[in-house]
């Protein structure tokens, strides 16, 4: 996703997928049973209904700062728009979309800028669900089970399922020796032995299920679907993607309360203080913040 959006100079070559993982809801087992999500196909509309009823809250990374959050967000939009061939700029202005996606994102009770950090945050306790990579739901469950705690049940929203691809590409700077070293590394990572080791970490290496010897990692009692044939949604163009992310940042996401603690001690005199002020200007001056999708929404509170 970000590789495609960021390679504006078309310098990346030899890109090949090393692993993939769907972005799913991991819901506390007991709650998933209560919601009727166990052993059945679940839609984004079903998830929205659970959020609207106050029965489901979840942790999710920021769509503007993390691939898992962005992938989930695009999947939500895709489903709420009725599964179009592709999301367009006009699609984003569809009547009712703003209200629905805002209601869905109102269920986010904690956020993070990283998928791994989100998993670590979730494991501190006190949360019912998280949206994350399937491989990190598996990892979280391995730790929860080792602690003797309730595990998560994986829910795959069938009408808005995003697949996170992990391609490895070479940034071409004209160095043929480095390019060959890259190709050797890529060949190693794509070898059968290493692909099997990657699959043992809970990451898939293809769209048509997992190998028999690794099924013990992809446990069906956790809701993991090792035999599911993954059909990824079609991602929008880079321009539409950025438009959607700006709407997420300024209109759709749950407003945040942010408290900044700034160090004005003597040790910050001179360059340190100048750099701190410059950093804050990149966040608080909205024209600057927009360049990195950090702008505030109308109802946000900054202290």
Report residues per predicted region.
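N-terminal segment of the mature folded domain
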Residues: 1-55, 59-62
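Extracytoplasmic
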Residues: 13, 18-22, 53-55, 62, ...
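Ligand-binding pocket segment of bilobal, Venus flytrap-like solute-binding proteins
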Residues: 78, 83-156
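Acidic, polar low-complexity linker/tail segments
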Residues: 206-260, 264-274
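…and closely analogous acidic/polar surface helices at protein-protein or active-site interfaces
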Residues: 254-256, 261, 266-303
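Periplasmic-binding protein-like
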Residues: 13-25, 95-104, 112, 147-174, 188-210, ...
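Short amphipathic alpha-helical coupling segments at ligand-binding clamshell hinges
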Residues: 176-189
């Amino acid at each position: 996703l970000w590789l495609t959006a960021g390679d504006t100079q078309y310098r990346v070559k030899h890109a090949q997928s090393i692993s993939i993982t769907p972005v799913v809801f991991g819901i506390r087992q007991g709650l998933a049973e209560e919601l009727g999500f166990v052993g059945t196909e679940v839609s984004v509309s079903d998830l929205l209904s659970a959020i609207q009823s106050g029965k489901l809250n979840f942790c999710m990374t920021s769509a503007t700062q993390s691939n898992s959050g962005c992938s989930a967000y695009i999947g939500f939009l895709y489903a709420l728009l009725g599964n179009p061939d592709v999301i367009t700029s006009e699609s984003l202005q569809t009547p009712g979309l703003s209200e629905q996606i805002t209601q869905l994102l109102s269920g986010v009770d904690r956020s993070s800028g990283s998928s791994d950090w989100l998993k670590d945050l979730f494991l501190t306790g006190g949360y019912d669900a998280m949206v994350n990579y399937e491989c990190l739901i598996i990892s979280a469950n391995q730790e929860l089970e080792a602690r003797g705690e309730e595990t998560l049940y994986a829910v795959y929203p069938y009408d808005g399922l995003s697949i996170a691809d992990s391609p490895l590409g070479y940034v071409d700077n004209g160095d043929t020796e480095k390019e060959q070293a890259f190709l050797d590394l890529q060949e190693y990572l794509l070898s059968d032995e290493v692909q099997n080791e990657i699959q043992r970490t809970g990451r898939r290496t293809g769209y048509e299920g997992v190998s028999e010897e690794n099924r013990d990692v992809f446990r069906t009692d956790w809701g993991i679907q090792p035999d599911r044939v993954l059909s990824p949604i079609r991602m929008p163009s880079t321009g539409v993607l950025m438009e959607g992310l700006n709407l997420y940042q300024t209109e759709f996401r749950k407003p945040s309360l942010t408290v900044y603690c700034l160090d004005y001690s003597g040790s910050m005199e001179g360059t340190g203080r100048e750099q701190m002020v410059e950093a804050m200007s990149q966040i608080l001056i909205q024209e600057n913040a927009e360049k990195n999708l950090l702008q505030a929404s109308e109802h946000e509170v900054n202290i």
